[in-house]
Amino acid sequence: MEVFLIKALQLMLSLSILVLLHEGGHFFFSKLFGVRVEKFYLFFDPWFHLFEFKPKNSDTTYGLGWLPLGGYCKISGMIDESFDTEQMKQPEQPYEFRSKPAWQRLLIMVGGVLVNFVLALFIYSMILFHWGDDYVSTKDMTQGMKFNTEAKALGFQDHDILVGTEKGEFKTFDGDMYRDISTASRVDIIRNGKPMSLNLPGDLDMLSMIKESPRFVEVYIPLQIDSVMKDSPASKLGLAKGDKILAINGKKVESFNDFQLELGRVGDVLASASTHQDSVKALTASVEYMKASSDTLKNNVLLLADKENVKFGFYNHPVMLDYKVTHISYGFFQSFPAGIKYGWNVLAGYVGDMKYVFSKEGAKSLGGFGALGSLFPSMWDWHAFWMMTAFLSIILAFMNILPIPALDGGHVFFLLYEMITGRKPGDKFMERAEYVGFGILVLLLVVANLNDVLRFFGIM
């Protein structure tokens, strides 16, 4: 419960910052061009609000709603998600959105997206200035990588060290590395201490590379018992630090990657068990191991968990701690170009990955607030918090600029149409478009959060 609260608080604080500043972008340009803002709210307030106030001589009511799904800035004379059609029937007023020239209305609509994007670049810059950049380069991962059968068919071997492609060297083992490999025609590696290259098709499906079990490529993790949990199957077996597990159910496990894969297979069998007896049978495994103090091979049968849960109960040695960490420090002025470059790469990667959303697997990967919350660490960490806030700011900026009615991008699309053709879409058309866009957003919200629920119950 404590972990859930920490993640939930981080998500709520992050989204509150982003929503306030996003709506603040609309607010700023509205005030700049003399457009009246009727309401400025954090969180939505259907039926009631937690509190609100209206400063003296101000046209704007500020408030806090109770539904933490965002916020809004109600601008006079604008067809938006408030669906205030009565106002649009009244004569046009000089302080209304609809009375302003198209270029001013355009800036008001892109104000939120602009603020979110600039905010992300600023946060990344300040992170680099305050903490610097720490990472483990792929070429410094001396144990190399672990590859699945599809990768091995292309010529990769376990323990190959990935260096880069024709596009340049990999920085570290991350999503950018996967993106480069998926579109590369050549990958440079180090095998047995010698540099060499492999030819690639250039059109690998990145989503399949990541979704496959095992994945196309993973960091090779040696199987090294670091510590054993009390009263766990591992402790009942008498395992301790330094001992080696050699096989599970007759399947050889040479790495922690192999070990996790075999436990996953046990979990798959357990998931299809229909009776308690079947569950016990699935959880009963033969384990071949060797004590650090002896060269004698041992083989025992044990129950992998006391409950219907696959669990062995030991902590593996974190191999990443053995590798050289590269640290780059940035001065105040140096941090801005570095932060801008970093943020731009994040945006480019996110936009490039959007094509996978329209695939069957991509649709399953959609997530709602539960998925967003899970991205935050289980302990409060300001570095991780600001990194995630900057990332969410980029997502918010990109998603809002999509040409979907009810989003900023939908309004921008119709404004650009007006500026190019000189014809302004009618109010009735805009109202209908807003309803359609709102329906699309509600549907996406339901699907994304339904996916969270299905994942929580292990159905997806």
Regions found by a protein language model. Name each.
Residues 84-123, 165-208:
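Interdomain regulatory linker/hinge segments that flank or connect interaction modules
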Residues 22-25, 64, 151, 159-162, ...:
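Terminal peptide-recognition signature
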Residues 3-88, 399-421:
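Small-residue-rich helix-interface/hinge motifs
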Residues 71, 75-146, 434-438, 443:
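Internal alpha-helical transmembrane segments
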Residues 3, 7-11, 100-109, 113, ...:
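Residue-level signature of transmembrane alpha-helical entry/exit and packing/kink sites
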Residues 127-171, 209-247, 251-255:
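PDZ/PDZ-like domain segments forming the peptide/carboxylate-binding groove
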Residues 15-19, 74, 116, 392-401, ...:
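Alpha-helical transmembrane segments of multi-pass membrane proteins
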Residues 2, 92-100, 212-247, 251-252, ...:
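Functional transmembrane alpha-helices
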